[in-house]
Each structure stands twice: as structure tokens, then as C-alpha cells.
UniProtKB/Swiss-Prot annotation:
Record-linked PANTHER family: ER DEGRADATION-ENHANCING ALPHA-MANNOSIDASE-LIKE PROTEIN 2 (PTHR45679:SF6)
UniProt biased composition (Polar residues): 586-608
The protein, known as: Alpha-mannosidase I MNS4
Listed GO MF terms: alpha-mannosidase activity; calcium ion binding; mannosyl-oligosaccharide 1,2-alpha-mannosidase activity
Compartments (UniProt record): Endoplasmic reticulum membrane
Cofactor: Ca(2+)
Lineage: Eukaryota, Viridiplantae, Streptophyta, Embryophyta, Tracheophyta
Highest taxon above the source species: Eukaryota
Source organism of this protein record: Arabidopsis thaliana (Mouse-ear cress)
Length: 624
């Protein structure tokens, strides 16, 4: 069969996977219209407050809510985790009263001088990120949520917390330990094994903290960790899942875009966009190109050996679902659409995405049947709708809402699903449900009704952290100085005389030099005209950050990739009748299950497409 014809056929089949927006037993659902989008947005707002009020009334100040029993539990450090994680969602929803009262309570009551051993990764993305995002909102008139009485209390807490985590970075490789005691540092018996995501997903929060405090140490240690991981990449430019932070040896060489690695890729691109640091862009471009070359089995992604590219794990895991959203940010929208289509078909089959779905057996992976309210697929849906305005993503959003409302809602919040096939509930609600899951759902529908929210129509462009926290691209954070103390690093603002000359200020009238030891924002015009080169072209306008795929490796001595012969199975959700659509390009027909027979990872034109009749008549999905 002609290779061009095969790829055309493949593209047509993929475009049809989204055709199955079904209600009950094959009854077709109408596409979401503006009035319904507004109703869904309001419903999601109600979902947030059902869970937030449940936490505040039954669990606060413990870390997280047990929504079935209406009790609380300390799961991370015992410092009101869910409240901190929810702060910028409250601001996004325009809830000035609760945002203000929450910030004031945290500023007066929270402390980190506690004998608790915590995850460096989770504490950074949830607590440090939550504090920094809320600080940037509460201290800025332009956000519309400034708190008049606020005096940088959250920033003080953020710096205190980050300093308590610095001992974790004291390793020969620069890659941090996975855990640290907030009072005593790293325990002598602490494991030396950490995940790639755990060590390489700190640059946004630590970098922002350096910009706000004028102390480069936080940005330096986070960047050194990324360098330490990237320096140990394979000849194929792939990284493994787990590494020894002392020896630099990979203890798990499975490369992928999901569990244990996912946000490493995410923060490479986002750190460049936020800070304008081109070293991050270079690493991202090389890492992304290799991921697409060796991990991508269009539209799915597999795990391979980082040295040989041999497939070791033909499984879709739910953490991979962030990838289409990252691709949108990178300007690679077409493969993002195809992959999101495939991932969403798993949700349609079960009503949720299991932690693992085996692509060879077309079944939930053993031991990975749960859905812990993860946001990644919803996040990618938001980004794809923002990029395309295709109403199919609103339809997907409606399915998400229905699944959560009818399958996960509990007396005091929303429950984990322990088994996506039986829809069993578990008495736990992660803080990220309020930080991310409902946030992205609300943004999706708000965008459909000409939103006026902080993110889409606010004073700044925002980067979302991997925990969904809002980090603004502002001159204070994003502009690099012309003279830096280390390559690619933040240049501290220590030339007071130069700044005063440029800004026309008199140092003798500086009444604030001893009041507060943190960075005061300078006028934007002064920075751009006098001290800094200004926002980069990418920061201003955005463009594709993706490099073309390499056809020949630059080093001829590098080992050739060896790929095991195996079938990668592409599933659809359900066979449905033709769906009427007003929008151009929305067609529907019976959806086959598709398989790609294994071949060389570099010779996709040699792959065969096989079409099979769907044999699953009892696939479960929630629809409104």
C-alpha cells in the first residue's frame, strides 16, 4: 500500500475518534451551545464550593479532606495544604472575601519550623507554588484582587520554606533528595533514589522566588538539578525514570512522558517562556524531538529503554494526558489533537481515565484501576479549546462534569475512584482537585462565554505551574539583566545607583531600604528602556518551539535503536450513529479499533494499519 495513502487513511480514522459524544445507549448529545456553557461554568463553580466548603467545615486546618466520612487528615506536612493549594482558584473565581480571609489566616498562623519530613517535589509545587501565586495576586493592584492590608507575609513564608528545603540539593550531582525534614534537613538514612520529575520540576517556583527576593540561590539549585539530569541523558537524548542522586546512575531506565518523568518536559518549556532563559529552550527542543521520535506511536506514547529505544511498556497512563496541552504551548497542535482524541476515548469507555490502560490487551492495567481526580486530561482539553475554539472540547468538558458529578461526588466533596470499571469510591480528596481539576474545567467553559477572568483577560500572560498555580510573565519575573553572575542565571538587581539614574530616582530619598529586604518592583518603562533587553519575541507573541525530527544521528558511533516487535493498539470509545453537526468538519461514523503492528521506531511508513470491529458494547461513560 502506498505510504502516503496509509497516512491519509490513518489521519481520517483518527479524526473520527471524537465523533462519539453519546448520551445513553447511543442517543446522540447536542453540541454545547453558549447558554449551556454558561450553565456548565456555574455548575463547576458550585463543584468547587461544594468541595472547598466541605474541606473548610470538616477538615481545616488539616491538610486534606476525607469527603465520604467528612473528616480531615494530614497527608503532607500538616499545614492546611488544601487551603494553600486553593488560594489562586479563589482569586480566579473573584471571591475577594474568602481569598482575603484565607491569605490573612495563613499569614498569621502558618509556620514551617516543624519536625516533618516532606516530599521536596510535592511541597514545592503545592505549597511553595501556592504561596507565591497568591502573593503575586494579593500584592498587585492590576490583578483586581489586591489586599490593602497585605504586607508580603506569604513571600516571607515562601522563602522560609524554600530555605528549609535547600539541604536536599547538597548532593554530588546537584539533583536533590526526594525528601527533607523541615527542621533537621536530610536524614542520614534518606533514600538516594529520586524520580526525574521529582528532581527536575522545581525551576518555576524556585526561579520565581529568586526573582522576588533577589537571592539567586534558589534558581541556581533548581537549574543545577535540571543540568544534572540532562547531563546524564542517553545517546538518544532520553532520560530515565529514577536516578541515584549521588552516583548519577539510572536505577530505572524506562523513558516516557508519563509517571516519574512527565513534568520534567513541562518545566523545560515553561521555564523558558517565563524567564526567557534560552538554555531551557535548547534542552526542551532536544528532549521533545527525541520524545516524538522514540516514544511517539501516533497517537499514543509508550515507554522505551532510554539506551536502545526498545519498547518496554505499551501502556497509556493518566499522567501522560498533560502532553497535548504542552504541545499546544509549544506550537505543535496537530499531534496534540490526535493524542487528545485517543486519550479521551479511554475516558469515554470508563467514565474516567484509569491510572493505566494496556494498549496491547485493550483493558485496564492490573493494579492501576483508580482515578484520583487527576486534572491532566481536562487541562489539555482547555488548552486545545483555547487554541482551536473547536466545540468538541466543550462537549468533552460536559462529559467530565457529568462523570465527576454522578460518579465522584460525595457528601462533603469529591472522592477518588478506586476502580473505574466498578466506579467504587474512596474516602480521599487530593488538594489538586481544587488547585487544578475544577480550575481548568471552569476556565474551559468561561472561555466559551467571552470570559473576563484573570487568566484570559487579565493584565498579564500567565504560565500555569504543574499544580495549576498562576505565575505571571511580568518584567519583575521575566526580564533578565545584561550582566549575569552565572551562565543562564538570574541577574540580581544590585546596581542601585544605575537603577536610580535610569529611573530618575534620588537615593537620598529612599525610605524603604531597611523596611523590607525584598525586591521592590521598578516601573516597566524604566526596565525596558534602561536596564533590560525587554521581553523576548517568544514571550511577547509566542511561536513554535519544536525542532524538526532528526533523520540521522549526529554521532555515527551511537548505538542504533532496537525496537521489539509488538502491537500498539489504538482504541476508540463506541460505535455510534452519524451525528448531525452545524460546525464544518464534524462528521461521525462507526468507530473501529485500530492497531499499529510493530516496526522500527524510525520507519513509521513501514507500519501497517489494521482495522477491527469494535467488540465492546458495554463501555461506560457519563454524559449530561
Amino acid at each position: 500500500m502506498d505510504s502516503n495513502f496509509k497516512w491519509l487513511l490513518f489521519a481520517i480514522l483518527i479524526s473520527l475518534t471524537f465523533s462519539g459524544f453519546v448520551l445513553h445507549h447511543g442517543v446522540l448529545a447536542e453540541s454545547v451551545k453558549p447558554d449551556e456553557a454558561k450553565q456548565l461554568r456555574d455548575e463547576v463553580r458550585g463543584m468547587f464550593y461544594h468541595a472547598f466548603d466541605g474541606y473548610m467545615n470538616n477538615a481545616f486546618p488539616l491538610d486534606e479532606l476525607r469527603p465520604l466520612s467528612c473528616q480531615g487528615e494530614d497527608t503532607l506536612g500538616g499545614y492546611a495544604l488544601t487551603l494553600i493549594d486553593s488560594l489562586d482558584t479563589l482569586a480566579l473565581l473573584g471571591d475577594r472575601e474568602r481569598f482575603t480571609s484565607s491569605v490573612e489566616w495563613i499569614g498569621k498562623n502558618l509556620q514551617f519550623n516543624i519536625n516533618k519530613t516532606v516530599s521536596v517535589f510535592e511541597t514545592t509545587i503545592r505549597v511553595l507554588g501556592g504561596l507565591l501565586s497568591a502573593h503575586l495576586i494579593a500584592s498587585d493592584y492590576a490583578t483586581g484582587m489586591r489586599i490593602p492590608s497585605y504586607n508580603n507575609e506569604l513571600l516571607v513564608l515562601a522563602e522560609n520554606l524554600a530555605r528549609r528545603m535547600l539541604p536536599a540539593f547538597d548532593t554530588p550531582t546537584g539533583i536533590p533528595f526526594g525528601s527533607v525534614n523541615l527542621m533537621y534537613g536530610v536524614d542520614k538514612h534518606e533514600s538516594k533514589i529520586t524520580s526525574t520529575a521529582g528532581g527536575g520540576t522545581l525551576s518555576l517556583e524556585f526561579g520565581v522566588l529568586s526573582r522576588l527576593t533577589n537571592d539567586p540561590v534558589f534558581e541556581q539549585v533548581a537549574k543545577n538539578a535540571v543540568r544534572g539530569l540532562w547531563a546524564r541523558r542517553s545517546n538518544l537524548d532520553l532520560v530515565g525514570a529514577h536516578i541515584n542522586v549521588f552516583t548519577g546512575e539510572w536505577t530505572q531506565k524506562d523513558a516516557g512522558i508519563g509517571t516519574s518523568i512527565d513534568s520534567f518536559y513541562e518545566y523545560l518549556l515553561k521555564a523558558y517562556i517565563l524567564f526567557g532563559d534560552e538554555e531551557y529552550l535548547y534542552i526542551f527542543q532536544e528532549a521533545y524531538r527525541s520524545a516524538m521520535q522514540y516514544l511517539h506511536k501516533d497517537p499514543w506514547y509508550v515507554e522505551v529503554n532510554m539506551d536502545s529505544a526498545a519498547i518496554v511498556w505499551p501502556v497509556f497512563n493518566s499522567l501522560q494526558a498533560f502532553w497535548p496541552g504542552l504541545q499546544v504551548l509549544a506550537g505543535d497542535v496537530d499531534p496534540a489533537i490526535r493524542t487528545h482524541t485517543a486519550f479521551f476515548s479511554v475516558w469515554k469507555r470508563y467514565g474516567f481515565t484509569p491510572e493505566g490502560f494496556n494498549l496491547a490487551t485493550l483493558s485496564v492495567q492490573y493494579g492501576q484501576k483508580s482515578y484520583p481526580l487527576r486534572p491532566e486530561l481536562i487541562e489539555s482539553t482547555y488548552w486545545l479549546y483555547k487554541a482551536t475554539r473547536d466545540p468538541r472540547y466543550l462537549d468533552a468538558g460536559r462529559d467530565f462534569v457529568a462523570s465527576l458529578q454522578y460518579g465522584a461526588k460525595c457528601p462533603c466533596g469529591y472522592c477518588h475512584i478506586t476502580d473505574v470499571e466498578l466506579h467504587k469510591q474512596e474516602d480521599h480528596m487530593e488538594s489538586f482537585f481544587l488547585a487544578e481539576t475544577v480550575k481548568y474545567l471552569w476556565l474551559l467553559f468561561d472561555l466559551a462565554v467571552d470570559s473576563d477572568n484573570l487568566v484570559d483577560n487579565g493584565p498579564y500572560k500567565y504560565i500555569f505551574s504543574t499544580e495549576g498555580h498562576l505565575l505571571p510573565i511580568t518584567p519583575q519575573i521575566s526580564l533578565a539583566r545584561e550582566h549575569c553572575s552565572y551562565f543562564g542565571g538570574y541577574c540580581p538587581s544590585n546596581s542601585t545607583k544605575l537603577e536610580q539614574e535610569v529611573l530618575g530616582e534620588d537615593s537620598s530619598n529612599d525610605d524603604h531600604s531597611n523596611d523590607y529586604p525584598y525586591h521592590e518592583s521598578f516601573p516597566v518603562t524604566g526596565l525596558i528602556k534602561g536596564l533590560c533587553p525587554g521581553l523576548t519575541h517568544a514571550q511577547k507573541y509566542g511561536f513554535s518551539y519544536v525542532l524538526p525530527e532528526k533523520t540521522d544521528r549526529e554521532d555515527v558511533n551511537q548505538p542504533k535503536p532496537v525496537v521489539t516487535s509488538s502491537s500498539i493498539v489504538l482504541i476508540s470509545d463506541q460505535t455510534v450513529e452519524k451525528r448531525p453537526q452545524e460546525e464544518e468538519g464534524f462528521t461521525s461514523q462507526s468507530e473501529p479499533i485500530m492497531t499499529i503492528s510493530g516496526g522500527s521506531s524510525n520507519d513509521q511508513t513501514g507500519q501497517e494499519l489494521t482495522l477491527l470491529e469494535s467488540e465492546t458494547d458495554d463501555q461506560r461513560s457519563y454524559s449530561s
